[in-house]
């Protein structure tokens, strides 16, 4: 990953960065995509559909199928179908999906930092 010159005053470069950020967030948008990605990271091995479904509380089959298809289309998840009876289908992160790891960790760290800041501000207001 390269260092960005965040003080860049080139409007074209700023637009390129904004567009890239929007594209990345589009891939991750929705309630379930990040949960699916986190489950696949945590598993450290391919998961069958039923295993994913069991690991994710409150997701229905239709939504899981839809989200997996979108993640597959975006190159984040790969679906492997084994030619056997009964059919066996597994899902795993692609190289592009694995490359999301540091960004996901940075988002998690940022979210915890932000949450802690709000907690501290609430405590100050109570006093």
Task: Tell what function each PLM region has.
Residues 2-6, 38, 99-127:
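Amphipathic alpha-helical dimerization/coiled-coil segments
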Residues 15, 23, 46, 53-55, ...:
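Non-catalytic interaction surface on structured domains
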Residues 19-63, 90:
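N-terminal helix-turn-helix DNA-binding core of bacterial DNA-binding proteins
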Residues 1-28:
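N-terminal leader segment of winged-helix/HTH proteins
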Residues 83-107:
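Basic, amphipathic "hinge/linker" alpha-helix immediately C-terminal to the N-terminal HTH DNA-binding motif
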Residues 49-82, 86:
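Canonical helix-turn-helix DNA-binding module
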């Amino acid at each position: 990953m390269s260092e960005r010159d965040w003080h860049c005053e080139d409007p074209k470069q700023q637009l390129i960065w904004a567009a890239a950020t929007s594209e990345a967030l589009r891939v991750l948008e929705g309630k379930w995509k990040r949960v699916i990605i986190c489950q696949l990271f945590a598993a450290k091995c391919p998961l069958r559909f039923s295993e994913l479904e069991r690991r994710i509380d409150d997701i229905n089959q239709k939504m899981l199928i839809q989200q997996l298809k979108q993640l597959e289309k975006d190159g984040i998840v790969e679906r492997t179908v084994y030619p056997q009876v009964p059919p066996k289908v597994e899902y795993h992160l692609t190289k592009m999906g694995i490359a999301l790891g540091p960004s996901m960790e940075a988002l998690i760290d940022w979210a915890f930092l932000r949450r802690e800041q709000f907690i501290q501000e609430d405590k100050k207001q109570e006093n």
